[in-house]
A protein has these predicted regions:
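NAD-dependent ADP-ribosyltransferases
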Residues: 1-217
Length: 217
């Protein structure tokens, strides 16, 4: 995470869930399939992504069908061979060079409360230490966003389509070849490096969002 200069990480959600994150360091990770299925049932909500963690994208001028005269022009093809299976924990990342950028109001769709992690390096360190002790091997990084109309090549769990860029996401990915619906573990209280607050969306910049008084619960 170092070269990306993340100053804060933010987890949006319901108060009861975020309290557990703050108080116990509860890391609740959803199966990748949750996000794929969510878009199918909620296409208007950008919380889900039908192409989540697919492994390749390619652009084609024309696709012709065998034994048919049918042709389709300008086609984008996504491929998934289940290279990436497992769990995701998603957060909003605030970078040192965009603290004056406005906080997108669509983030309210993720919940009316937020845990603001004031020391991202320490937070990730604690997760990695837990992972080492429990053979989980978490990978942590900001998400790279790509233009799906032009990009071709391999994909990985830290790449998403450009339409999701307002989420400014950093995520934790843990591989598991036979994942359950979710993975949940505790790293211990993070009250020393984080605060819980209720959101107030009044065209706040990231700086205003971070400096307004917290609402510890």
């Amino acid at each position: 995470m170092g070269k990306f200069s993340i100053s804060h990480l933010v987890k949006f959600g319901e108060q009861k869930h975020l309290y557990r994150l703050l108080k116990y360091g509860e890391i609740y990770m959803k199966n990748i399939d949750f996000y794929r299925e969510y878009e199918l049932s909620n296409p208007e909500h950008l919380r889900g992504d039908i192409y989540e963690c697919f492994n390749n994208i390619s652009q084609h001028n024309t696709i012709k069908f065998l034994d048919s005269d049918l042709e389709i022009n300008n086609v984008t093809v996504y491929e998934n061979n289940n290279t990436y299976t497992g769990y995701l924990f998603c957060m909003y990342a605030i970078f040192t060079d965009n603290e004056n950028k406005g906080l997108d109001s669509r983030m309210l769709d993720f919940g009316e409360y937020a845990v603001i992690i004031l020391n991202p390096k320490e937070f990730i360190y604690r997760i990695k230490e837990y992972g080492k002790a429990n053979h989980l091997f978490p990978n942590c990084s900001p998400v790279m966003y790509f233009n799906e109309n032009y990009h071709s090549g391999t994909l990985h769990p830290f790449m998403k389509r450009e339409k999701y860029s307002y989420q400014s996401e950093a995520r934790i990915y843990i591989h598991n070849s036979n994942p359950l619906d979710y993975l949940c573990f505790n790293i211990g209280s993070i009250e020393d490096i984080a605060i819980l607050k209720r959101l107030d969306y009044k065209s706040q910049s990231n700086t205003e969002f971070l400096t307004t008084s917290d609402n510890r619960q």
